[in-house]
Amino acid sequence: MAPPMTLQQWIIWKKMNKAHEALQNTTTVTEQQKEQIILDIQNEEVQPTRRDKFRYLLYTCCATSSRVLAWMFLVCILLIIVLVSCFVTISRIQWNKDIQVLGPVIDWNVTQRAVYQPLQTRRIARSLRMQHPVPKYVEVNMTSIPQGVYYEPHPEPIVVKERVLGLSQILMINSENIANNANLTQEVKKLLTEMVNEEMQSLSDVMIDFEIPLGDPRDQEQYIHRKCYQEFANCYLVKYKEPKPWPKEGLIADQCPLPGYHAGLTYNRQSIWDYYIKVESIRPANWTTKSKYGQARLGSFYIPSSLRQINVSHVLFCSDQLYSKWYNIENTIEQNERFLLNKLNNLTSGTSVLKKRALPKDWSSQGKNALFREINVLDICSKPESVILLNTSYYSFSLWEGDCNFTKDMISQLVPECDGFYNNSKWMHMHPYACRFWRSKKNEKEETKCRDGETKRCLYYPLWDSPESTYDFGYLAYQKNFPSPICIEQQKIRDQDYEVYSLYQERKIASKAYGIDTVLFSLKNFLNYTGTPVNEMPNARAFVGLIDPKFPPSYPNVTREHYTSCNNRKRRSVDNNYAKLRSMGYALTGAVQTLSQISDINDENLQQGIYLLRDHVITLMEATLHDISVMEGMFAVQHLHTHLNHLKTMLLERRIDWTYMSSTWLQQQLQKSDDEMKVIKRIARSLVYYVKQTHSSPTATAWEIGLYYELVIPKHIYLNNWNVVNIGHLVKSAGQLTHVTIAHPYEIINKECVETIYLHLEDCTRQDYVICDVVKIVQPCGNSSDTSDCPVWAEAVKEPFVQVNPLKNGSYLVLASSTDCQIPPYVPSIVTVNETTSCFGLDFKRPLVAEERLSFEPRLPNLQLRLPHLVGIIAKIKGIKIEVTSSGESIKEQIERAKAELLRLDIHEGDTPAWIQQLAAATKDVWPAAASALQGIGNFLSGTAQGIFGTAFSLLGYLKPILIGVGVILLVILIFKIVSWIPTKKKNQ
């Protein structure tokens, strides 16, 4: 293609064209003249005018076909830009009009009833193949829900916290004390020990030890008292004036029943039976009683040498069975504890030695039985060791013939009631045991008679003989049930003026100087002086003789594991404790962090209880049990097992077993009513911070459990509550289905008396009751007050929309975008049917019982909401939410804030056909003609154009930013190219 001509060439070419056109139309000029004229034009000096230059400029711009096409392309692009700009401008104008158009009005409070008649086929009896449709009438009751909110009963009371108090309790469990209270045998004691160890070990296996900032409980006076009271409360040391043993090997105590199995009435096992010498008729040859039992008689009791040691100087006993009348077994353990402490404080003077008036007359000439009682006649049966080791004299109660020189011939003289007893029929009307001896002299001497050659099995003939079937002869005689020849003789054993020490008082004094650990260590060793701990013996048998013991014992330094000091101990770091708590999942409102709230106890309202609430509360388990002394052995163990298992279960669930905490004491300290205490006890939480075994032996065990309690003190308790269930409403506007819900400022409606209160809860936990830090009283949504307007949230949903929730009363909560069973669409309704029917593809069943109206149903103020026309589209755009309130001013404010988001549609960032169709739907109610045109364009682009271009056309939506960038670059290049065609200087050609 030839390049464009220069200006001179173009002017000459233009003149030659004009000359050629002029010469073609004339006949007067010859050919030679024409050639001459052309040559003159070519040789003529050209002087271009402005008009020539302008025309030449136009020539250069369109000199070639490519330049013409470029101009055409540029014009088309400019035309498209103009058209698109006009379209966008018109669309923006239309969007602004659509925004300002008000949409639907939501108005709840609609109640209606319908009779639904589904067709149900019924088989005719005469034709098994024929089925005929018959109408079935189903009554459907529909009640719309005000403001789209359903209220269901909230059964849990709502408790508002006033403050949180922390409280520590140390629970001590000593199986020996429990066994003594229940009078258990050694075999049952072992079972009890195993049971306690099993339950406590299982609790310890799932608990971790950590510290609380309340100090070491072992430095607390109450802990020291409880610990030592549990170990040494009834332990005493008696010092003889001069060591003297029991004078004889034998003991006559005919007032005690004999052992054995007898028909009829049986007696409880007596401790003295351990020393009974049974009468046996088969003995070795030449066997005598003296050879084995000394002066003791067969059929009586033998005192072993261990109780008759010559050099025994002290008696150590741990028993409550020698106390005088002030100690009543019918009292509770706490009452007896209080009485005992008062006695010990009054009967000691800063030392562990008891005053003389605390002792019985038999022990001291100045005794007044202030603490201990006199030993009675029957004590030898149940407490033989106490009589043998502590009595200064003994009165034998004998029914043996020959004692006191009583014989059969003298019975009539000794007992007036027996005068002439054997000479008349009086004996037929008296007791068969009356007026005779228990043991009669049958032989002149005791001897054995053997067969020839027999030395091991010979017949033995005792000096006294009588059938043992009369096992309760002496006891009945002592009760004076019949006249008998009783011989009572006094035996002087040892001198008076005993000196008695209280081990509990010794602990009280020594622990202040040496510490509780050292004192416990020394005194426990002292109780184990003979190899068997005295406090682990049965109460009635816990009496042992000691040979010159050192008392008070020495108190060596005992290294103890401190709980508060970090020096010289098995370090349990705080960080490790926190890590353990987190790993174990403890969450007692922050576990250890909550312990800092113990400072709340400094409230002035609790001044009288500060020292109690701040220190550890020490509790003995045996003091909290029922009276187990009336139970038999296994029943007492089962009773304790039930208590322990319940305690363990409660602690694992972080609850409090109030059996072991005095709620009366706590109520006095907190000054709360009974109803408030019920709530406090119900919502209180517990946390075990240590479980340890403090003593272990085959027949006894002792444990300590450290418990931390978190007590929530209520400020207010809301009852009769209703829970808010926000269902919402459906709105279809601008071709979009929208789920609209009101953001109510409350979660609970409370009805107290006649006042309805709307509550907003903050920082709540659910522990049986709902416990909240903050509860605010707010106003409901309504048109009456500008301050009560509530935001409305809109969310785009897809059609069809069906939401059916069955309610507890047998009704159904329905929200649907369509109608079925004459249930209205868009409106949330409570539907109740009287027969089973199918609606929305689901079976609606009648309630099991007739529907009952509640006495109180929350009532809300009437509320009408007018929503913007484009509320559905607003909600659909990238999840944007618009807040719409019930006042017109608020709506305008919300619309202004939403305009910026709505006008983003002008800068299209999505699928073009969908955007145009959305615009058409929004314009339909405002400008139907424009909406039809836009709908047609959108349908063409999404339908026909999609079919023509296929996937490539749809990809343009994703490649649009790239294509626009490339197009802009090409357009700039084209413009620069066209500009370069314009001559800026004279060309030589």
From Swiss-Prot:
Documented effect of changing K18R: Strong increase of subviral particles release
Result, substituting K53R: Strong increase of subviral particles release
Miscellaneous: Foamy viruses are distinct from other retroviruses in many respects. Their protease is active as an uncleaved Pro-Pol protein. Mature particles do not include the usual processed retroviral structural protein (MA, CA and NC), but instead contain two large Gag proteins. Their functional nucleic acid appears to be either RNA or dsDNA (up to 20% of extracellular particles), because they probably proceed either to an early (before integration) or late reverse transcription (after assembly). Foamy viruses have the ability to retrotranspose intracellularly with high efficiency.
Reported effect, K15R: Strong increase of subviral particles release
Organism, as annotated: Human spumaretrovirus (SFVcpz(hu))
InterPro entries the record matches: Foamy_env
Domain notes: The ER retention signal plays an important role in establishing the intracellular site of budding.
Region feature (Fusion peptide): 577-599
Cytoplasmic face residues: 1-65, 983-989
Stretches assigned to the Lumenal side: 89-961
Record's protein name: Envelope glycoprotein gp130
Gene name as annotated: env
Biological function: The surface protein (SU) attaches the virus to the host cell by binding to the cell receptor. This interaction triggers the refolding of transmembrane protein (TM) and is thought to activate its fusogenic potential by unmasking its fusion peptide.
CC per GO annotation: host cell endoplasmic reticulum membrane; membrane; viral envelope; virion membrane
Regions crossing the membrane: 66-88, 962-982
Domain of life, per lineage: Viruses
